Amino acid sequence: MIWANGANSDRLEFSTSKEVTVAPTFEDMHLKESLLRGIYAYGYESPSAVQSRAIVQICKGRDTIAQAQSGTGKTATFSIGILQVIDTVVRETQALVLSPTRELATQIQSVIMALGDYMNVQCHACIGGTNIGEDIRKLDYGQHVVSGTPGRVADMIRRRHLRTRHIKMLVLDEADELLNRGFREQIYDVYRYLPPATQVVVVSATLPYDVLDMTTKFMTDPVRVLVKRDELTLEGIKQYFIAVEKEEWKFDTLCDLYDTLTITQAVIFCNTRRKVDWLTDKMREANFTVSSMHGEMPQKERDSIMQDFRQGNSRVLISTDVWARGIDVQQVSLVINYDLPTNRENYIHRIGRSGRFGRKGVAINFVTSDDVRILRDIELYYSTQIDEMPMNVADLLS
């Protein structure tokens, strides 16, 4: 039984199943080589909490309920699971993802296409409000994965353009929202057309009774994964940008700031492992003391670098996003984005602080003319303001 304290209660006790193990790296998941390449090219270095627990269960074919909010890496969790189990040689729909909104369905399609970049995967977003003729053309051509909203998907199945006989997996993303928006009948409609052995994966931020009621009808002995998100906030963080005309000038700008950096401890983020190595060498050549870390390093080496940094033995750490997720060093009060993050969720992971500590801090973004759009996008996404850096930035840190 999934719930522990009365079926009609909305306060459901939910915990991770005992058989769920943690895969610390993507290599430990025994994924296809072409998929692994896509994962690294997408910018992932190590799996998030939900990814390290749920991907293996999904790949094993288990019905899975993952309670996870957005920002935890849930979309990539089921996308990687889907890409591992489909056979791209067979040009038929083998996985179906239902989402509550058109935007989410389209976003999922782009994640699947990006992660499956080396697999030659066909994925179509089948959503309301778009040209039906285009849907029919795409579906008749053959799609390995369909990501859509329940109404349009049910319609395409009824019209026999979306063929269901090869479907192995159904994913319900944001299941609580799907039911909130009154999609229950359409979901049941779709489910009726699927082969009896279809694997079902449910992802939901909350698990109200109606979600669990649906899972009992659709799922067989589901494995459960619960991941709580560490709420991150930008509150109390002063955010600035420095306009740098050319990429090559970032280095001099960083050197000018070095004395300011070492007032406390600083982390400098670059987007690639190669850039981290390059910047570390260049800083050392210029006689600056820095340490560096990225996902290619053996875990042992990473641990010892982290320990040095935690103890304050090293004051400036250059890293990729591998450092950003969930590593909390109390005394870091300055973060520099040498490169702006390629995906905006990583911005808060780099500079945000978990509410438990609510520390003050300063973030400085190096912005070339190409980056202005990304910076504006970050401001909009987080409803925050990033100002030009004042001259007295050192005073803000001391």
Swiss-Prot record:
- Pfam families per the UniProt record, alphabetical: DEAD, Helicase_C
Q: What class of enzyme is it?
A: hydrolase
- For this protein, what is any one GO molecular function term? mRNA binding
State the EC number(s).
3.6.4.13
Residue numbers of motif Q motif? 24-52
Q: Reaction catalysed by this chain?
A: ATP + H2O = ADP + phosphate + H(+)
According to the UniProt record, one GO cellular component term is:
catalytic step 2 spliceosome
Protein origin, superkingdom: Eukaryota
Q: Where in the cell is it found?
A: Nucleus, Nucleolus
Chief subcellular location: nucleus
Intervals of motif DEAD box: 173-176
Tell me one GO biological process term. mRNA splicing, via spliceosome
Ranges of residues in domain Helicase C-terminal: 236-397
**Helicase ATP-binding domain segment(s):** 55-225
Against SMART domains, the record matches this protein to: DEXDc (SM00487), HELICc (SM00490)
UniProt entry keywords in alphabetical sequence: ATP-binding, Helicase, Hydrolase, Nucleotide-binding, Nucleus, Ribosome biogenesis, RNA-binding, rRNA processing
Residue positions binding ATP: A68, Q69, S70, G71, T72, G73, K74, T75
Matches recorded under PANTHER family: ATP-DEPENDENT RNA HELICASE DBP3 (PTHR47958)
| Membership in a protein family | Belongs to the DEAD box helicase family. DDX48/FAL1 subfamily.
- Reproduce the free-text note on domains from the UniProt record: The Q motif is unique to and characteristic of the DEAD box family of RNA helicases and controls ATP binding and hydrolysis.
The function of this protein is:
ATP-dependent RNA helicase involved in 40S ribosomal subunit biogenesis. Required for the processing and cleavage of 35S pre-rRNA at sites A0, A1, and A2, leading to mature 18S rRNA.
The protein, known as: ATP-dependent RNA helicase fal1
Annotated organism of origin: Aspergillus fumigatus (strain ATCC MYA-4609 / CBS 101355 / FGSC A1100 / Af293)
From the UniProt record, report the name of the gene that encodes this protein: fal1
